């Protein structure tokens, strides 16, 4: 069945909500880092990800916790310690990330060639 222009976006693209959750700005690097390196404190995540501001990282971590993709653990010590780790639900994305990594390794050179050809044409 061909989607009509009156169909809601979720029907027109059923993976749209997943793309919004998993591939929004900074979310993918956070999930990738927690998957690859395990439980981490805020500063460790910030260091690994790079240019993300503390405010934005905090917002993304809260959103991912709300979505059930990460777990935040508060340790009532002096000084207080907070750690983040990927949840079972977040871990279920591992095959998707592996597939995307494989696709990138194989196809990004072709994307670079296409971009260069496009730029040469001056389009």
PLM features: residue spans?
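HhH-family (HhH-GPD) DNA N-glycosylase catalytic core used in base-excision repair
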Residues: 1-9, 19, 106-123
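N-terminal helix-turn-helix DNA-binding core of bacterial DNA-binding proteins
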Residues: 9-56, 67, 83
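Alpha-helical linker/hinge and terminal dimerization helices associated
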Residues: 32, 67, 96-111
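A short, conserved structural fragment
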Residues: 65-75
């Amino acid at each position: 069945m061909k989607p009509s222009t009156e169909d809601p976006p979720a029907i027109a693209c059923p993976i749209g909500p997943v793309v919004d959750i998993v591939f929004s700005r900074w979310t993918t690097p956070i999930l990738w880092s927690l998957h690859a390196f395990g439980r981490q404190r805020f500063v460790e995540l910030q260091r690994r990800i790079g240019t993300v501001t503390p405010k934005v990282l905090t917002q993304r971590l809260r959103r991912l916790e709300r979505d059930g993709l990460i777990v935040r653990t508060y340790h009532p010590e002096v000084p207080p310690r907070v750690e983040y780790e990927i949840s079972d639900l977040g871990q279920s994305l591992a095959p998707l990330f592996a597939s995307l990594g494989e696709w990138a390794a194989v196809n990004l050179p072709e994307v670079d060639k296409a971009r260069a050809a496009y730029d040469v044409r001056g389009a």
